A protein has these predicted regions:
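Buried hydrophobic positions in well-ordered alpha/beta secondary-structure cores of metabolic enzymes
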Residues: 1-2, 75, 123, 143
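ATP/NTP phosphate-donor binding region
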Residues: 1-64
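Short, ordered loop/turn segments at secondary-structure junctions
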Residues: 1-3, 43, 79-81, 105-108
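Short glycine/serine/threonine-rich phosphate/pyrophosphate-binding segments
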Residues: 5-8, 82-87, 119-120
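Accessory alpha-helical/coil subdomains and C-terminal extensions
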Residues: 17-32, 147-186
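Short acidic/histidine-rich motifs immediately flanking catalytic phosphotransfer sites
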Residues: 68-74
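Short Gly/Thr/Asp-enriched flexible loops that form oxyanion-binding sites at enzyme active sites
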Residues: 76-98
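Internal gly/pro-rich beta-alpha loop/helix module
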Residues: 102-173
Length: 186
């Protein structure tokens, strides 16, 4: 998944599907102490193409990363069309204290002002941070951290499309800051 975050537009203006795993490997901003393993699900056409079986398979992959691979944090990169619904499902089905961050992008990677690289970098840094431990699934876009239980897509194309009544924190200048901890029921 995660079509927009890594997609590019060629010289003719046609949108080209990029390899998300290769896109992540090409980023050079990671701290040396963050080890990244990538499980790519390129079979999902776009955010709007995600179906319930895709959500369930993603939950299985995340659970496997946490339980078998001992992941300290997980980042799910996906399209934004059904991000709020998928994030809510991930929170409901996973019930984990391990940081799980959902992110994506509103603009393709080659667009002016593309926010995808910053969203991805912030998501990875946050997932590796102890600050997110016990918060459940969160959505990070445009530096804001939102609980998966309350996030909404408020605009179809604006980079600040996602919001919630009370963002729980933010990632700024690489620092993860949590302002409030949502009450979670298990």
């Amino acid at each position: 998944g995660g079509s927009t975050i890594a997609d590019q537009v060629d010289a003719s203006g046609k949108r080209c599907r990029a390899d998300l795993a290769e896109y992540i490997r090409s980023m050079h901003e990671f701290d040396g102490n963050i080890e990244i393993s990538i499980v790519a699900r390129n079979d999902i056409a776009a955010g709007y193409g995600m179906q319930i079986p895709d959500v369930l398979e993603t939950v299985r992959e995340v659970r496997r990363a946490i339980d078998e691979d001992q992941a300290d944090g997980v980042v799910i990169v996906m399209g934004t069309d059904c991000m709020e619904e998928a994030a809510f499902a991930f929170e409901t089905l996973l019930q984990t204290d391990v940081p799980v961050v959902v992110t994506g992008a509103m603009r393709v990677a080659t667009a002016r002002g593309a926010e995808g690289p910053a969203n991805l970098l912030n998501a990875i840094r946050a997932a590796a941070s102890d600050a997110l431990s016990g918060l459940g699934v969160v959505v990070i876009l445009n530096e804001w951290i939102h609980s998966a239980l309350y996030v909404q897509k408020l605009h179809p194309s604006n980079c600040a499309a996602f919001g919630s009544e009370f963002p729980i924190g933010m990632v700024a200048e690489g620092d993860v800051s949590i302002r409030t901890r949502p009450i979670r029921r298990k």
